[in-house]
From Swiss-Prot:
Part of the 30S ribosomal subunit. Forms a tight complex with proteins S10 and S14. The keyword RNA-binding applies. Residues 38-106 form the KH type-2 domain. One of its GO terms (biological process) is translation. PROSITE patterns: KH_TYPE_2, RIBOSOMAL_S3. The keyword Zinc does not apply. It comes from Streptococcus thermophilus (strain ATCC BAA-250 / LMG 18311). This is Small ribosomal subunit protein uS3. The gene is rpsC. GO terms for molecular function: mRNA binding; rRNA binding; structural constituent of ribosome.
Length: 217
């Protein structure tokens, strides 16, 4: 019935990297729950800071958290006050030494999570769902996307029967594994209930690095 595999999960290990990099045996469940707690806490604390990806790397009694954000100044704060407070709270939450790296997202209009978040917030402010999607598509294409597809589903305009409506521009080759496709889904809380927002952005092909050949072979 036209179900789609998760575009990022399909490409992990091929052109995408893992968001969590660590190995564990007996502690696996504890680390996994700790990761979930860290992500939930950061998303709550930095809800307005346009945080997209949260990468977690573990060493012995040390956790390295990389935050990909479109607003690094808001995350860092005046003289680093915000990031210091966040680090202290994460140290307390995990009981381990937490290091925080801030990675700036140069083009937020090419990040599916941030685009979906923008559409969802507009829907909560009663912006027409068609207009919100079309504006997001225009911004992404202007920023250099090769293709973009969006979908909003739920009780659109307060209709009694829920439905899904989407728009697309350019190409979004979901079956091409070397295609760099970013995907995200968000939720908008409206007076009529929740609306689901899905975004696929095709940013071009990622070609594997050429291997060095000896003897001209």
């Amino acid at each position: 019935m036209g179900q789609k595999v998760h575009p990022i999960g399909l490409r992990v290990g091929i052109i995408r990297d893992w968001d969590a990099k660590w190995y564990a045996e007996k502690e696996y469940a504890d680390y996994l729950h700790e990761d979930l707690a860290i992500r939930k806490f950061i998303q709550k604390e930095l809800a307005d800071a346009s945080v997209s990806t949260i990468e977690i790397v573990r060493a012995v009694n040390k956790v390295i958290v990389s935050l990909h954000t479109a607003k690094p100044g808001m995350v860092i704060g005046k003289g680093g006050s915000n990031v210091d407070a966040l680090r202290a709270q994460l140290n307390k939450l995990t009981g381990k030494q937490v290091h925080i790296n801030i990675v700036e997202i140069k083009k937020p209009d090419l990040d599916a999570h941030l685009v979906g978040e923008t559409i969802a917030r507009q829907l909560e402010q009663r912006v027409a769902f068609r207009r919100a999607q079309k504006q997001a598509i225009q911004r992404a294409m202007r920023a250099g996307a090769k293709g973009i597809k969006t979908q909003v589903s739920g009780r659109l305009n307060g209709a009694d029967i829920a439905r899904a409506e989407g728009y697309s521009e350019g190409t979004v080759p979901l079956h091409t594994l070397r295609a760099d496709i970013d995907y995200a889904w968000e939720e908008a809380d409206t007076t009529y209930g929740k609306l689901g927002v899905k975004v696929w952005i095709y940013r071009g092909e990622v070609l594997p690095a050429r291997k060095n050949t000896k003897g001209g072979k």
